[in-house]
Amino acid sequence: MKLMTMPSEFQKALPILTKIKEAGYEAYFVGGSVRDVLLERPIHDVDIATSSYPEETKAIFNRTVDVGIEHGTVLVLENGGEYEITTFRTEDVYVDYRRPSQVSFVRSLEEDLKRRDFTVNALALDENGQVIDKFRGLIDLEQKRLRAVGKAEERFEEDALRIMRGFRFAASLDFDIEAATFEAMRSHSPLLEKISVERSFTEFDKLLMAPHWRKGISAMIACQAYDYLPGLKQQEAGLNHLIVSLKDNFTFSDHHQAWAYVMISLAIEDPKSFLKAWKTSNDFQRYVTKLIALYRIRQERSFEKLDIYQYGKEMASLVEGLRKAQSLSVDMDHIEALDQALAIHNKYDIVLNGSHLIKDFGMKPGPQLGLMLEKVELAIVEGRLDNDFTTIEAFVREELAT
């Protein structure tokens, strides 16, 4: 197969391939970018593989950076762009089902492609637009099928994260997993416990944000892979609820919304501990935990002005997005009106602060001062007090007198 026209991302990188070829080596576009071009999807990263060894690659170009030279990768700075160029390589026995014990550089494109996970990711493209397909990846692309390169059992024993990648690709590409590949994923799912939680989180997160995320979750359920992921053991019912409880065409707006609804579906009692088990950041934990709290408030009643002040319009909109997907009542205009009606959006908008209370009222730093500032803040938010210096002073004077 030959591409009639190269996408602009590849055209810009063609001089890189030409330079390598002129130096006497092979060079190709490889991996997901080739797959996405053939599927007419946007390209995110342009990866180049070459028969030149790292030191040989560095000798060809004036500006390079060693970004992963032990794995054969050199970053080339050329024509205003940055390109990762990786030497063809083979990988020795994998350690802990996660990483190869040794990487060996080779001159053969086929040897390089055969170590990849799925046939649709094992395609290469030369400078003339000719697709090199050593493992029937083009047929799999046409039939929307995800199939492991070579023996599926070996691929998942080498790196068990490929199981999670399989679920993610099913979700992002809307592909079905080939039977033998699926069976190997199912039988090797216990190996997911050997994988770092951070790597599993990244794949699961991408799955949730994919347009066909239900397909990925369904495959995970069928493989019983969830039993080997943090907080998901024996959660088949909750995961099924996740799939069926939202409208068919719904996709999550952002990562926080996705993980919040996962925990809502699973009826997780301690969201922060659940997210800690996934080794997420403290900021992520705080935001998602607040989002779940706001969702539960909204299930009981309509939003009030204080809700929008404390949680923010953006978070309230994420909650309404989930409610809409559940065919529940939503009122985005109400959220907007409440936000517009707020005299302040945070405590720093208040014209009077703690220093004024200390100076003008002789208050001392401590709990009493903090409590007074909270009273002022709440009164302004609820509309009982104008954000005006004189008015606030009168309010404080009255509070101190009681």
UniProtKB/Swiss-Prot annotation:
Keywords: ATP-binding, Magnesium, Metal-binding, Nucleotide-binding, Nucleotidyltransferase, RNA repair, RNA-binding, Transferase, tRNA processing. GO terms for molecular function: ATP binding; CCA tRNA nucleotidyltransferase activity; magnesium ion binding; tRNA binding. A single active site specifically recognizes both ATP and CTP and is responsible for their addition. Pfam families: PolyA_pol, PolyA_pol_RNAbd, tRNA_NucTran2_2. Mg(2+) binds at D45, D47. Homodimer. It catalyses: a tRNA precursor + 2 CTP + ATP = a tRNA with a 3' CCA end + 3 diphosphate; a tRNA with a 3' CCA end + 2 CTP + ATP = a tRNA with a 3' CCACCA end + 3 diphosphate. One of its GO terms (biological process) is RNA repair. Its EC number is 2.7.7.72. The keyword RNA-binding applies. CTP binds at G32, R35, R116, D159, R162, R165, R168. InterPro entries: Bact_CCA-adding_enz_type3_sf, CCA-adding_enz_C, CCA-adding_enz_firmicutes, NT_sf, PolA_pol_head_dom, PolyA_RNA-bd. Its cofactor is Mg(2+). Catalyzes the addition and repair of the essential 3'-terminal CCA sequence in tRNAs without using a nucleic acid template. Adds these three nucleotides in the order of C, C, and A to the tRNA nucleotide-73, using CTP and ATP as substrates and producing inorganic pyrophosphate. tRNA 3'-terminal CCA addition is required both for tRNA processing and repair. Also involved in tRNA surveillance by mediating tandem CCA addition to generate a CCACCA at the 3' terminus of unstable tRNAs. While stable tRNAs receive only 3'-terminal CCA, unstable tRNAs are marked with CCACCA and rapidly degraded. It is an enzyme of class 2 (transferase). It comes from Streptococcus pyogenes serotype M3 (strain ATCC BAA-595 / MGAS315). This is CCA-adding enzyme. Belongs to the tRNA nucleotidyltransferase/poly(A) polymerase family. Bacterial CCA-adding enzyme type 3 subfamily. PANTHER family: CCA TRNA NUCLEOTIDYLTRANSFERASE 1, MITOCHONDRIAL. ATP binds at G32, R35, R116, D159, R162, R165, R168. SUPFAM superfamilies: Nucleotidyltransferase, Poly A polymerase C-terminal region-like. The lineage of its organism: Bacteria, Bacillati, Bacillota, Bacilli, Lactobacillales. NCBIfam families: PRK13299.1.
